[in-house]
């Protein structure tokens, strides 16, 4: 019973978040240096990282505002710089 309760609580919290936002940060394989933002599901914030310029994944946003909008983060919860 406790397991089911925990499962539904976790599922409910993750339900409203865009799936792309749950992907891990991925700097990509190239060696460029593009400042970008990603959603950190542990801190529940959009955080800055340096993108290499190719590959990577969809958890990669040009601006803090874009990351917050897509991932449903309130501005006062961000930013956290790496």
Curated annotation (Swiss-Prot):
* GO MF entry, a single one: serine-type endopeptidase inhibitor activity
Q: Which SMART domains match?
A: KU (SM00131)
Q: Which pairs of Cys residues are joined through disulfide bonds in the record?
A: 21-71, 30-54, 46-67
**Alphabetized Pfam families for the sequence:** Kunitz_BPTI
Keyword terms, alphabetized? Disulfide bond, Ion channel impairing toxin, Nematocyst, Potassium channel impairing toxin, Protease inhibitor, Secreted, Serine protease inhibitor, Signal, Toxin, Voltage-gated potassium channel impairing toxin
Asked if the keyword Thylakoid belongs to this entry, the reply reads no
In this UniProt entry, which residues are annotated as the site Reactive bond for trypsin? 31-32
User: Primary place of residence?
Assistant: secreted
Query: Known InterPro entries for this protein?
Result: Kunitz_BPTI, Kunitz_BPTI_sf, Prtase_inh_Kunz-CS, TFPI/VKTCI-like
UniProt keyword annotation of Signal present: yes
Under CDD domains, the record lists:
Kunitz_actitoxin-like
Tell me the leader sequence span: 1-16
Q: Which residues form the propeptide?
A: 75-82
Localization, UniProt:
Secreted; Nematocyst
The BPTI/Kunitz inhibitor domain covers 21-71
Q: GO CC: one term?
A: extracellular space
- Other noteworthy facts: The primary structure of the mature peptide is identical to that of kappaPI-actitoxin-Avd3b (AsKC1) from Anemonia sulcata (AC Q9TWG0).
What is the role of the protein in this entry? Dual-function toxin that inhibits both the serine protease trypsin (Kd=30 nM) and voltage-gated potassium channels Kv1.2/KCNA2 (IC(50)=2800 nM).
Q: Which family does it belong to?
A: Belongs to the venom Kunitz-type family. Sea anemone type 2 potassium channel toxin subfamily.
Instruction: Write the protein's name.
Output: U-actitoxin-Avd3f
